Amino acid sequence: MPFREVLGRTGRVHTLSLPLRWSDFDMYGHVNNSAYLEFSQDSRVAFLKEMESIAGKGSVPQVFVRHAELDYRRGISPSSRTVTVNSEVTRIGRTSFGVRQLILDSDGIVCCEVKITQVAVDLRSSSPREITDSERQVLESMITRPVKEIERGQDNEPDIDQLVPPDSTE
């Protein structure tokens, strides 16, 4: 299952393993910076589809990306054949929600942190719209927060840095 519970936290983290393709590498043998954005996009699409498969068709808003921020921490190991992307909902607003992703190499080392703001849209008008109560309920079931912070009334973004790629048997 692509969703995993994280001990001591509410919500769930979505995990997706992606193969590295020849086209992901630049002429220097490094994974090109644009490939990280593709990994992020592929994982977000899978994340939304998985949420919808659990909660039902039409339960997740149609979205456009409003903002993307990538923090490249280190290059992906040249020996890596796959990357793992851990995705979590971090906040929910009136028309948008935040997703935080960690891209890990095959050794489980965090190589990039991605923060995305996605806006719910009316596809007919391509205009932002409010997240419905039922969509909000689905998104809230995915939001991850440390239980201790919730008990203290804090709402900081959780730290999923310690998640490792799932076993290949999952």
For each of these PLM feature ranges, what is it?
Residues 1-84, 90-98, 102-170:
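Terminal targeting signals and extreme-terminal segments of soluble enzymes
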